[in-house]
Design a protein with these regions (language model features):
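Bacterial N-terminal signal peptides
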Residues: 9-20
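Non-catalytic architectural context of zinc metalloproteases
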Residues: 36, 48-50, 65, 70-79, ...
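N-terminal secretory signal peptides that target proteins for export/translocation
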Residues: 1-5
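Juxtacatalytic substrate-recognition/specificity segment
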Residues: 47, 210-335, 341, 345
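Early extracytoplasmic/domain-onset interaction patches
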Residues: 25-63
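Extracytoplasmic
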Residues: 28, 42-44, 53-55, 75-77, ...
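Acidic/histidine-rich catalytic neighborhood
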Residues: 285, 316-384
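C-terminal recognition in membrane/secretory proteostasis and scaffolding
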Residues: 346, 356-627
Length: 627
């Protein structure tokens, strides 16, 4: 809800807020954050807000950019005290909008002092609401520790922020340092918009590496870990990130930031995800990600994806997501561009920069294609609806994901943009590509500072037509609104490849299974299971579904033998063609039954095969562009 005032407040209230905002523009709000208790999972803030006497409503940020939903972690806000000249000021929460606080500023008062604590979660899921601290590090998201005047534009409200760190800790951020001493640092005054867009990574074991030092503006890899060895990535990996910086310059022909910081948290004590910002990214991964080759490869998309968002999502942003403050609801209908195009370009950049080999890229692409070759939920819900409903889908979990669908605009969006790229290449005989669209669309205006240039569906269509004339509106809508069981595979076919299935998993699939401790039998028996035999998901209308299996059930035995993944694989192999059916003993909530799966197709794992006579456009796409 964006209307923050009760209807009876009337005009006098609006005037009071307006005068308060006017003063805030000439006298910034100061926000002092104390992180010395971060290892104990409690952060402290003191906020001093210039005000004028009368009614005032302040709000806690609700709709967080990049999270695409009303995810502001207000449930972990605590210790909210307001004083004026040392005397308490009573506040009252709005009865409808839980993020709004009403109060009356006493006569003669020109500023309010507010105390806010944030209880850093131990949860290993969620974005800024998830775990963000450990004994040796912390990631500060400013939106968790502030309020601001209601009905104001985030770009108009100015803040002077500062932080105080535990002894011996260092930090990285896109904010400019203004002053300070000891463990306290003051940053240059910025708008609320820029503040929320500029997290701070800090820790005891902190390292900063300058990337592609010959480029302007400057780029930095900032790392904080729970142990000193975890920030010692190899020279080879640093060189790959150097190339990533150069490849983005070659692709986007522009940069829209004063400097850029990859803020990488290496810890199992924090939630693992990536969250984009204009001049930085909040990248949280497992502790050994930079020193273990398998983990580095599996996480190879993360930094290219979040970096790409600086152009696609932060600079060029869907109009429905370009809201003026953090209380106005966002519209996610163009997330298939915001996230889908970013997923596509991020994967391509990972290959172009050498983070992945071309073969690793293709193996990952085969797993995406196979998932969307077997996506029954598409028959009732199109990819457009997953984008529109994004705000309720990020938290969706549990079984039957293939039937409910989730944030499919990421990976199915990637298939759509591969289709766009290969179509342009095919129509122009290789003379033009999606690179040309990106250079025009995201390079609009050349190099700029961090600002937002919104776009609509029609702008995307016009941008594609500026590269090559085509009925792009129909092209896109036919894919976005499709209810076919399988997602469109035109990008693979135009790229010179087709999806096939073989009896052995490719190296990428094997790495994913080893990392997650799960085993993927979706394309044979139609189920996904853990090492212990716990069924994590079942493919709707697949063999296991028709046999009566469901998520959460426990596989006890296979053909009379105690379950192991290898025993199940052997049973699938033995059943091929005219072999015996696979017989399972299954436990479900304390009850047991025998399930007979009459399947004879053998093991099936995805791979990409070349299509004879079609140019290998996919390999052309993966070639480095930087000179």
């Amino acid at each position: 809800m964006s209307g923050l005032w009760m209807k009876c407040a009337g005009t006098a209230l609006a005037v009071a807020v307006g005068s308060s905002v006017a003063m805030a523009q000439t006298a910034p709000i100061t926000l002092s954050v104390d992180l010395t208790d971060a290892p104990r999972k409690i952060l402290h803030a003191t906020e001093v807000m210039p005000v004028t006497p009368g009614p005032l409503t302040v709000v806690y940020p609700k709709w967080i950019p990049g999270e695409h939903g009303p995810t502001g972690p207000i449930e972990n806000m605590a210790g909210f005290f307001i004083t004026a000249n040392g005397q308490p000021v009573k506040w009252e929460r709005d009865k409808v909008d839980m993020f709004a606080y009403h109060l009356t500023v006493p006569q003669g008062v020109t500023k309010l002092e507010m105390k806010i604590d944030f209880l850093a979660s131990s949860s290993l899921s969620g974005f800024s609401a998830g775990g963000s601290t450990s004994e040796n590090l912390a990631l500060l998201s400013w939106n968790t520790l502030l309020v601001y005047p209601a009905d104001t534009n985030a770009s108009d409200v100015m803040f002077t922020p500062s932080i105080t760190l535990p002894a011996g800790w260092k930090f990285g951020t896109a904010l400019d340092k203004e002053g300070g001493s000891g463990q306290m640092t003051t940053f240059r005054t910025v708008s609320l918009e820029k503040l929320v867009d500029s997290p701070v990574l800090t820790g005891r074991y902190f390292r900063e590496v300058a990337l592609a030092p010959e480029t302007t503006p400057k780029h930095y890899l900032d790392m904080a870990a729970d142990g000193p060895e975890e920030v010692e990535l190899s020279k080879e990996h640093i060189a790959e990130f150097d190339r990533l910086v150069r490849e983005t310059g070659a692709l986007y022909k522009s940069r829209h930031y004063g400097s850029y910081h990859f803020l990488v948290t290496l810890s199992d004590e924090v939630a693992h995800f990536g969250l984009e910002h204009h001049q930085s990214s909040d990248d949280r991964v497992a502790p050994r990600t930079f020193i273990d080759d398998q983990e580095f490869t599996l996480n190879g998309l993360l930094l290219p994806h979040e970096f790409t968002h600086s152009w696609n999502g932060k600079y060029r942003r869907p109009a429905g997501l370009a809201t003026s403050n953090y209380q106005k609801p966002m519209e996610g209908d163009l997330l298939w561009v915001y996230e889908g195009l970013t997923e596509y370009l991020g994967d391509v950049l990972a290959a172009r920069s050498g983070i992945w080999t071309a073969e690793q890229y293709k193996q990952r692409l085969s797993t995406i294609a196979a998932e969307y070759d077997n996506r029954p939920g598409r028959t009732w819900r199109d990819i457009q609806d997953t984008a529109t409903a994004a705000q309720i889908l990020y938290a969706a979990g549990g079984g039957w994901d293939n039937w409910r669908l989730s944030v499919d605009y990421y990976d199915e969006g990637e298939l759509i943009w591969l289709d766009v790229d290969t179509t342009i290449r095919k129509m122009t005989d290789g003379k033009k590509s999606l690179n040309d669209f990106v250079a025009k669309f995201h390079g609009l205006g050349g190099d700029t500072g961090p600002k937002v240039v919104p776009y609509t569906f029609d702008d995307v269509v016009a941008g594609l037509n500026s590269v090559v004339a085509n009925d792009w509106a129909t092209f896109l809508r036919s894919r976005l609104d499709s209810h076919a069981y399988q997602a469109p595979m035109g990008g693979l076919e135009n790229g010179g490849y087709k999806l096939t299935y073989t009896d052995k998993p490719n190296a990428w699939s094997a790495m994913e299974d080893a990392e997650s401790g799960s085993y993927d039998f979706r394309y044979s028996l139609g189920l996904h299971t853990g090492k212990s035999g716990r069924v994590s998901d079942v493919l709707k209308d697949g063999v296991a579904d028709k046999g009566g299996l469901g998520p959460g059930m426990q596989l006890i035995a296979v053909n009379g033998r105690a379950f192991t993944p290898d025993v199940l694989k052997a049973a699938i192999h033995d059943a091929k063609d005219s072999g015996p059916a696979v017989e399972l003993i299954v436990e479900n909530t304390g009850f047991y039954k025998v399930v007979r799966l009459d399947y004879h197709g053998g093991e099936r794992y995805p791979r990409l095969d070349r299509v004879p006579g079609v140019p290998d456009r996919l390999d052309d796409i993966l070639k480095p562009e930087a000179k």
